[in-house]
Design a protein with these regions (language model features):
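Structural signature of extracellular appendage/secretion-system components
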Residues: 1-241
Length: 241
């Protein structure tokens, strides 16, 4: 209401800048946490593949010993240790076979080890957001993403829950707060006066990004690789978010 009060204007602008930087820093921290999740998932997938390959190899050795009529106690202990280490990364179920081998499945039923063969997991980008990670398997020459519900328990399950629930909720809450506050502040700013002669309504002080509709990577594309269709979104009332 007193645009000529320059000292007050500078205080308000400084505090507004500080607030904007705080929102930006919070968003950057969420991005950093997400990058850490991706890196940890990649390491976990490599560890799982190493362990499942080890189980398949020991299965082969056990089958040979059992076939000769002997009991491979040391090999059984070695396999039990590998399964225990695997369980630290993902919840698994096991099924023994008559030949002494052990089949290993993730809790959702995906086969990891069957006899002397292991199925490798792979790190993949999320279908809707390439900055997020997902777990996949090779299926008929293509990567098939596993639902996170199949990977309950263990380090991988915890990382996926943190990514898909905690970080997603935190990012959404931060966006809602920023949009609602910016809208209200700009509305209040418009009720004031600027330094023009004659004075006019105050200009918006804050700006925030428009909402983004993320397309599935499997959506139809044209010959140039661009999505055929798109969706745009706007915020009609930020306070209702």
């Amino acid at each position: 209401s007193r645009p000529q009060d320059l000292s007050t204007r500078q205080v308000v602008l400084a505090r507004a800048q500080d607030l904007a930087q705080r929102y930006a820093a919070a968003g950057a921290q969420i991005d950093t946490l997400q990058e850490g999740v991706v890196q940890d998932l990649q390491v976990a997938v490599a560890s799982v593949n190493r362990l499942t390959q080890g189980i398949a190899t020991v299965n082969e050795q056990i089958a040979r010993v059992v076939g000769s009529g002997q009991t491979p106690n040391d090999l059984l202990d070695q396999r039990d240790q590998l399964v225990a280490e695997l369980s630290e990364f993902v919840q698994v179920t096991t099924l023994p076979a008559d030949d002494g081998t052990l089949a290993v499945f993730v809790a959702g039923g995906q086969r990891l080890v069957l006899g002397t063969q292991s199925t490798a997991l792979a790190f993949a980008s999320d279908e809707f957001d390439i900055t997020r990670g997902a777990i996949a398997v090779q299926d008929s020459g293509t990567l098939r993403t596993l639902p996170s519900s199949m990977l309950a328990g263990g380090r991988i399950g915890g990382l996926l829950r943190f990514q898909n629930e905690d970080l997603t909720d935190a990012r959404a809450a931060l966006g809602r707060m920023a949009a609602a506050f910016s809208t209200r502040a700009n509305e209040q700013q418009a009720l004031g006066l600027d330094l023009r002669a004659p004075p006019g309504a105050g200009a918006p002080m804050f700006a925030f990004g428009a909402p983004l509709a993320l397309a599935s990577q499997s959506n139809a594309r044209d010959v140039a690789g661009n999505f055929i269709g798109s969706v745009t979104m706007t915020i009609a009332d930020a306070t209702a978010l």
